[in-house]
């Protein structure tokens, strides 16, 4: 049977590419704006928690549509959620790691420009590659390893003399921001590969697994809210500092990942590479216009290296990842969750 991406038009693929690119770029810019605004600053831990709740509701809705009837939907929830405490415990691992990752993203964008963040965050590619080799016993081609080192060199150039934003009035700590990204990419690589391994361990639906993970995620993020900002939230309120822009960021975070996990089956690695590179370019342009970002030579060269390495990493390859045909669909399902 032909793969889904073989049956769609170029126009639809370009649509998928455009939406993925815009979501990645707009989310980063919008989040950066909400963290550097001169208005009352909201609690990022509450935003992460609400995002998990919305993802859970969306996944429940998609599962209901997938099962086709109320009876089968209830049976699926009863069997896979209420009757599977071990599976919930298993999915609590990526839930915890993703919660840390999402909170680190807020911390990073509070201290780094959106363009610098977008470029540096691409370190998730070598991190994921390393986790894939160690946890799933796959291999990478020589070209992929070259692209990994090229990407690391590009990020080093970007961080060597970071581009500065002249219109941002809040106090920033670039070193703290880079540390937050480092933690985020480690979390992204491990959690993504771990979740893929869980998906491949059974024939359980992706949306059931999402529900299991988001249920655990809500508990984990609520604990984070209490431990990190509990006293201030009790004084100021859970939704303190929320604006339309904050809700927009939450919407993008909730819908963006789920949308990407659905449309990625219609694209390929080259298109995803172009999408990531285009998102970097858009974020840079927006940062120059909105935040007064001053581009340095090292930033420009580093960004170019990162974009080229992303493209090279996604080039078609033969027998480089040791993934059988039956495993490919599972890999497609997990990207972007």
Swiss-Prot record:
Subcellular localization, as worded in the UniProt entry: Golgi apparatus membrane; Golgi apparatus
Bilayer topology annotation: Multi-pass membrane protein
UniProt record, GO biological process: carbohydrate metabolic process; CMP-N-acetylneuraminate biosynthetic process; CMP-N-acetylneuraminate transmembrane transport; N-acetylneuraminate metabolic process; protein modification process
Membrane-side (Lumenal) residue stretches: 31-45, 109-114, 161-175, 229-243, 289-296
InterPro entries xref list: Nuc_sug_transpt
Transmembrane segments: 10-30, 46-64, 88-108, 115-135, 142-160, 176-196, 210-228, 244-262, 270-288, 297-315
Cytoplasmic topological domain residue ranges: 1-9, 65-87, 136-141, 197-209, 263-269, 316-337
Keyword Transmembrane helix assigned: yes
GO cellular component: Golgi apparatus; Golgi membrane; membrane; plasma membrane
Catalysed conversion reaction: CMP-N-acetyl-beta-neuraminate(in) + CMP(out) = CMP-N-acetyl-beta-neuraminate(out) + CMP(in); CMP-N-acetyl-beta-neuraminate(in) + AMP(out) = CMP-N-acetyl-beta-neuraminate(out) + AMP(in); CDP-L-ribitol(in) + CDP(out) = CDP-L-ribitol(out) + CDP(in); UMP(out) + CMP-N-acetyl-beta-neuraminate(in) = UMP(in) + CMP-N-acetyl-beta-neuraminate(out)
Positions that bind CMP-N-acetyl-beta-neuraminate: 55, 101-102, 117-124, 188, 210-214, 272
Primary localisation category: Golgi
Chain spans, region Disordered: 316-337
Alphabetical list of Pfam families matching this protein: Nuc_sug_transp
GO molecular function, one term: antiporter activity
Keyword hit for Transmembrane helix: yes
Keywords: Antiport, Congenital disorder of glycosylation, Disease variant, Golgi apparatus, Membrane, Sugar transport, Transmembrane, Transmembrane helix, Transport
Implicated disorder: Congenital disorder of glycosylation 2F: CDGs are a family of severe inherited diseases caused by a defect in protein N-glycosylation. They are characterized by under-glycosylated serum proteins. These multisystem disorders present with a wide variety of clinical features, such as disorders of the nervous system development, psychomotor retardation, dysmorphic features, hypotonia, coagulation disorders, and immunodeficiency. The broad spectrum of features reflects the critical role of N-glycoproteins during embryonic development, differentiation, and maintenance of cell functions.
Record's function text: Transports CMP-sialic acid from the cytosol into the Golgi apparatus, functioning as an antiporter that exchanges CMP-sialic acid for CMP. Binds both CMP-sialic acid and free CMP, but has higher affinity for free CMP. Also able to exchange CMP-sialic acid for AMP and UMP. Also mediates the transport of CDP-ribitol.
Family: Belongs to the nucleotide-sugar transporter family. SLC35A subfamily.
Record text on subunit structure and interactions: Monomer.
UniProt protein name: CMP-sialic acid transporter
Source organism: Homo sapiens (Human)
Gene responsible for this protein: SLC35A1
């Amino acid at each position: 049977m032909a793969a889904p991406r073989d049956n769609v038009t170029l126009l639809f693929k370009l649509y998928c590419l455009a939406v993925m690119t815009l979501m990645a770029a707009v989310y980063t810019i919008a989040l950066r704006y909400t963290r550097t605004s001169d208005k009352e600053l909201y609690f990022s831990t509450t935003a992460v928690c609400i995002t998990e709740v919305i993802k859970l509701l969306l996944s429940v809705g998609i599962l209901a549509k997938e099962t086709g009837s109320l009876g089968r939907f209830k049976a699926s929830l009863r069997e896979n959620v209420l009757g599977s405490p071990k599976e919930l415990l298993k999915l609590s691992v990526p839930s915890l790691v993703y919660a840390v990752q999402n909170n680190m993203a807020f911390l990073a964008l509070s201290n780094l420009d959106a363009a610098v963040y977008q470029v540096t965050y691409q370190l998730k590619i070598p991190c994921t590659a390393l986790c894939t080799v160690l946890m799933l016993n796959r291999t990478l081609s020589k070209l992929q390893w070259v692209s990994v080192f090229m990407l690391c060199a590009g990020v080093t150039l970007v961080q060597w003399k970071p581009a500065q934003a002249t219109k941002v009035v809040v106090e920033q700590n670039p070193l703290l921001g880079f540390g937050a990204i480092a933690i985020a990419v480690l979390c992204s690589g491990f959690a993504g590969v771990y979740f893929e391994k869980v998906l491949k361990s059974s024939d359980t639906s992706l949306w059931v697994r999402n529900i299991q993970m988001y249920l655990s995620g809500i508990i984990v993020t609520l604990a984070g809210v209490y431990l990190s900002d509990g006293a201030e939230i009790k004084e100021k309120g859970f939704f303190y500092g929320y604006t339309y822009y904050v809700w927009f960021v939450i919407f993008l975070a909730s819908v963006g990942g789920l949308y990407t996990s659905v449309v990625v089956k219609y694209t390929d690695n080259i298109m995803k590479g172009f999408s990531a590179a285009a998102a970097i370019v858009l974020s840079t342009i927006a940062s120059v216009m909105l935040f007064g970002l001053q581009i340095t030579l090292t930033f420009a060269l580093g960004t170019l290296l990162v974009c080229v390495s992303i493209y090279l990493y996604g080039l078609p390859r033969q027998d480089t990842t040791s993934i059988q045909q039956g495993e490919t669909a599972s890999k497609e399902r997990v990207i972007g969750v």
